[in-house]
Amino acid sequence: MSERRSVDVPIGTPLSRDEFEAAIRAVGAERYHDKHPFHKLLHGGKLDRGQVQAWALNRYCYQDAVPRKDAALISRVHDRELRREWLHRVLDHDGLPPDEPGGIERWLVLTDGLGLDRDYVISMKGALPATRFAVEAYVRFVRERPLIEAVASSLTELFAPSIHRERIAGMLENYDFISDDVLAYFKRRLTQAPRDATFALEYVKKNAKSRDEQEACVAAVGFKCDLLLSLIHI
């Protein structure tokens, strides 16, 4: 688990809600994966088709893990309001056919558009072992760590919309094998991620009462940033 970030408040004193949120956002400002050189190459059209395929193939492991970690979180929750709120995350990714295909299906539309065999993508046989290990570590984190930390680990969604906007614009401009339709996953996340992040942030700010709990939540965001970085070391 990532080292807990220090905050300029006396040890043991709980942070104010604003200080706590600032500490969470500082993790993203320093460690979110949008700063990795890979994304500059991807969005700038500097990768060949095979490299883009490798990224999408590898990333599918994460897409597959997301509804499983959300279901794991729901299974631990006694609060009906939180369960109801979190349930839509599972449906966002798994879909509710025929009207809502879901995020996993949208990712497969991307890999289809890149020329990858769908069954091969779903099998995850072509993904790096380190990627499979990392995403399963995320599922275990959400299943086993205190609930407040499990919720906090989702807060990288606070930082996601900007990278999605950059990706949509950059890939459409720079790759002739990318069309508007295959980027539907990222377009949908422009509205889903802020909604989810707003709820999770308020939940964490309300329920992390002690300084130790607050620091653990900040560390959980750092853990998730490390996970996302591991997915692009391909």
Regions found by a protein language model. Give the residues of each.
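C-terminal, helix-dominated tail/subdomain
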Residues: 185-192, 202-229
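Anionic, Ser/Thr-rich low-complexity intrinsically disordered regions
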Residues: 13-20, 77
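Helix-loop segments that flank and shape redox-cofactor active sites
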Residues: 37-48, 66-88, 167-179
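Non-transmembrane, amphipathic alpha-helical segments
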Residues: 44, 51-58, 149-152, 185, ...
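Short alpha-helical hairpin
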Residues: 4-7, 20-47, 66
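Active-site-proximal alpha-helical scaffolds that flank and shape metal-associated catalytic sites
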Residues: 20-21, 26, 84-185, 226
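Extended cationic-aromatic binding surfaces that line active-site or macromolecule-binding grooves
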Residues: 51-101, 105
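Conserved small/polar residues in nucleotide/adenosyl-binding loops
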Residues: 232-234
